Amino acid sequence: SLVGSEMCIRDRIIIANTYALGGRDFDIQTAYDYMKKGALIPGTYSQNVEVRPGLHTYITKGIENASLCLEYTSADYAIGQFALQAMGNRDDADFFMNRAKNWKNLYDPSTTWLRSRHNHDLSWKDPNHDWREATKENYFWMVPFDLPALIDTIGGKAAAKARLDSLFVRLDAGYDDHFYAAGNEPDFQVPWIYNWIDCPEETGRVISRIFHEAYHATPNGLPGNDDGGSMGAWYVFASVGLYPMIPGVAGFTVNAPQFERITMHLPEAPLTIEGGGADLWVRSLKVNGKKNKSMWVDWKDICKGGSLLYETKKLRR
C-alpha cells in the first residue's frame, strides 16, 4: 500500500533513488501506480495520513505553503526520473519534471527569497510564515534538482556564495533561527552547493566544521533527531566523500573523504576510494584513472567497482 511518511512524500524519492542505483527487487509497476496516485489525486490517504495535503491548490495554482511546496517539487522531480528510467514514459517524465519547477512560483524578486502566497489572490504572505520547523534561510536551497536556475535567479555565483556564507555563520540553528541547522534535514545538502558555484574549498570547510562542531562520539552525539537514520546516513555519505544530491538521479557530488583509503564491496567488484583525511578539500578527482571534469561522479562509472582518487589539499584556517 501507499506508505505515509514525515511530510508524506519522501518515500517517492527513496523509491526513485533505489531504482536509479540499481535496486530492482520490488514491483516496479505497482510502485509507480501508487507514486502517481498520490501526486495526482487530491485527498489520497495512506495509514490515515493524507499523502499530499493541499494538492488541489498545488495542481491548480502551482503553489502551496512554502516548505510543503518545496517538498512536493522534489518528489515530483523524483517521480519524473522514475517515469523515465523505470517506465520509459517520456510524457509522464516531462510532466512531473516540469511541475517540479513550481518552486519558481515561490520566488519574490523584491526580496530575492522564496515565500508563501495566499491561495485566493496569490499575494505574498509574511516571509517568515509557512516554514516547517525551520526558516526561509534554511529552506531556500531545497531545490537540489534545479540549482543552476536557483543560482541564476538570485544573481549568479557571487550572490549565491554570499548567501551561503551568511548561512554558515553558525551550524546549530533551532526552528526559528536564520543560520544553518546541522540537525535538521532541509539543510543536509547545502554544504555541497558550493560545488555548484566553483568553490569546492568551501564545501570542504563547512563539512569539516560540521564533523568537528556538530557530531561527537558520545551517547548524545548527534546534532538532531535521527529521523529514519538520516543523521547517521549524512555522516556516512560525508565520510566517504560521496553525497546523493539530486532526487532520482544516480550520481554523487563530492567532498574530501575522512579516511586515507576506503574499500566498498560492491556486488561485482570492489570500489576503492583514496586520497582522503581530516580537514581537506578536493582540488580534483580521478575516476578509474581518468581525470574527472567536475565535482560530480556518475554511478554508472563506479557501480561495477573501480577507483576514485581524490587530489586534496589542507584547508586554510
Each language-model region and where it sits:
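Short, small-residue-biased leader/transition segments that mark boundaries at the very start
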Residues: 2-9
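C-terminal beta-sandwich/jelly-roll accessory domains of carbohydrate-active enzymes
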Residues: 276-317
